[in-house]
Regions:
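Non-catalytic structural scaffold of enzyme domains
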Residues: 1-249
Length: 249
């Protein structure tokens, strides 16, 4: 969707969220959403599985009606879950995520709600985000931690045929993950499916689409060092970006 205007806010000063409590994740996420609303955003996507798991519902139900009922805050878990029954043939799915995402049980609850016949196994991978954040995703340490968690989840449920990368950092480890997986296992990365779900959402809600500006601009905001964020973003995007440092607490 390149024609739309985007503001990306990375709360890098307080990341990772994965090990933090529900209350702290909610507070941080609420502050971030309010900041984006103050910047003029009409629709905010929580492009973080931990924030989607621990803060989305409270923000939607408690905060949004007070801020502006016409605006929307959406997450990344439901668009992922909706596809699981089509992708998994064995109906045994594994979720790779942060401690926060896995302990919240959000994936398991959502999958069981939609597809009661499916079996869901979660695996917390607490070192994966720091490896990516520190640009060590090609290191021997990454080899060790990737193999360790994949072996553990597949030993826990040998019938798993689909593994979900339940964190937006994890695609940078995807090639390393693929080398550790046995044949016959589908690796599910969220990005393109969440984007497709957003396109579908805007088609079904033309009133929201009409509220979105469409000049093709993109701003990047961070709560930490702009230079450090720019270096990390260039790894994800394969090109340099201009970044603004802000405070949201």
């Amino acid at each position: 969707m390149p024609g739309y205007d985007y503001i990306y806010l990375g709360d890098n000063a307080r990341s990772p969220y994965g090990t933090r409590s529900f209350e702290v994740v909610y507070r941080f996420t609420r502050q971030a959403v309010e900041t984006l609303f103050n910047e003029g955003c009409q629709l905010v996507i929580l492009a973080c599985n931990t924030a989607s798991a621990k803060a989305l519902r409270t923000i939607q139900q408690r905060d949004l009606p007070q801020w502006d009922p016409a605006r929307r805050v959406l997450g990344v878990i439901r668009p992922t879950v909706e596809l699981m029954d089509k992708i998994s043939k064995s109906k045994h799915v594994g979720i790779l995520g942060t401690n926060g995402t896995i302990t919240s049980g959000s994936y398991s609850l959502e999958i069981k709600k939609m597809f009661p016949h499916m079996t869901v196994t979660g695996e917390a991978c607490p070192m994966w985000v720091p490896l990516v954040e520190n640009n060590e995703f090609a290191s021997p340490g990454a080899d060790y931690f990737v193999r360790k968690h994949l072996e553990h989840i597949l030993a826990t449920d040998p019938e798993i045929d689909t593994l979900v990368l339940g964190c937006t950092h994890y695609p940078l480890l995807i090639e390393k993950i693929k080398t550790c997986l046995p044949a016959g296992i589908t690796l599910f990365s969220q990005g393109e499916y969440v984007a497709a779900s957003l396109v579908d959402y805007l088609h079904r809600h033309p009133e929201m689409d009409a509220r979105l500006t469409k000049q093709g601009s993109c701003r990047f905001l961070t709560t930490e060092s702009a230079a450090k964020f720019s270096d990390a973003a260039s790894v994800f995007l394969s090109h340099p970006v201009e970044v603004e440092q802000i405070s949201i607490d």
